[in-house]
Amino acid sequence: MKKRILRVFLALTVFILLLSLPVRADEAELYQNSGADTLMEVLPEEAQSLLQNVGADPMETPAPDAAIKLFSALSEGFRAEWTAPARALLTLLASCVLCRLVQEFAAKELSYAVSVCGALCAAVTLLSPMASLLEQAARVTDAAAVFLLAAVPVYAGLLCTAGNTVTAPTYGALSLAAANAVSVLSSAVLIPVLRVFLAFSVASAVTSFDLKRLTDALYKVIKWALVLAVTVYTGVLSVQTIVANSAEMAGGKAAKMLVSGAIPIVGSAFSDAFSVIVSGAALVKNGVGAFGLLASLAIFLPLCIKAAAWLLICFCAGLAAEVLGLKPLASFLNGCAAALRLLIAAVCSVGAVAVVSAAVVLCVRGAYA
């Protein structure tokens, strides 16, 4: 009897060892079957180029220094494009100094007209790059929405494969709803409102209409709406994920204990082998989640850096105009700065949705870990 039990035990041990051999192959197959190979294709060309430069691939776990390489590539790209903002800053500062000199030598009645001319000169300098930034913002928000629509089903499928069968449906529903909301709101609300805000800022600076209260109210409404939307999405997704994952962890531990106790002799070995297989799925999940995080940063960070550079220029030129007493010019430059702050906030809010969606995939633990 003892010999028979020993033979059965040895046979089962060999069988379990043979099952554990193809885990790495199954991991590569899981990458292929998850649909992660399509994530690179839906990204815009600039984001693809950045990710290729840092060696990020949706079919592999990113290197530990991939984020550092990404920021290095972004800084190199900014250094190659800094000449246009620098020329604009010099032009604006020269306009401020010239307008002040003309005011000193011209009649007092012409003082306001000279300042308005300075504002018009600043408009000629800034409106073209501002319009370009708004167009890029529209493309970036659309690209983020497209990436989310492609990535969320992959994320949810990998969560299910890793044993998170409760978390995945809730996560998928919330993230897909956010992706659709981002696409609609960015094209129908955010970008048109930013254009209207910029137009009001120009009109307030070069006409007798005082639209400052209107632009200030519009600025506050947009800012708080963005903060509220991102906070609600992040809070609801985080709470739902934490609660669901806690239930899954408890259920997973109970299942492992049941298998270990129900199957004599080799129950614990079966439980450990199953944990190894699920851990392979979790590695794939984490690799795709890390790529999604890098891809989200590659989508919206280049535009944020450009907008921040132009915001710094508007701030410096506006400060110079205020010091020199050029109120219409200072009003226009401050309006442009406010529009750029809203643009950065809008793009960062969309980026935050994409980053949080990928970060949740990284943070959720497997149910049978």
Q: What does each model-identified segment do?
A:
Residues 101, 133-140, 202, 213, ...:
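Membrane-spanning helices that line or support transport/gating and their immediate boundary helices
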Residues 175-235:
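Loop-centered beta-sheet repeat module
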Residues 95-99, 127-134, 154, 158, ...:
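Alpha-helical transmembrane segments of polytopic integral membrane proteins
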Residues 218, 324-345:
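Interfacial loop-to-transmembrane junctions
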Residues 120-129, 148-165, 185-193, 197:
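Mid-bilayer segments of alpha-helical transmembrane spans in multi-pass integral membrane proteins
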Residues 286-327:
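Helical hairpin unit composed of two closely spaced alpha helices linked by a short loop
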Residues 82-89, 117-127, 182, 186-190, ...:
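Hydrophobic alpha-helical transmembrane segments of multi-pass membrane proteins
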Residues 1-115, 128-139, 143, 147-148, ...:
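Gly/Ser-rich, low-complexity
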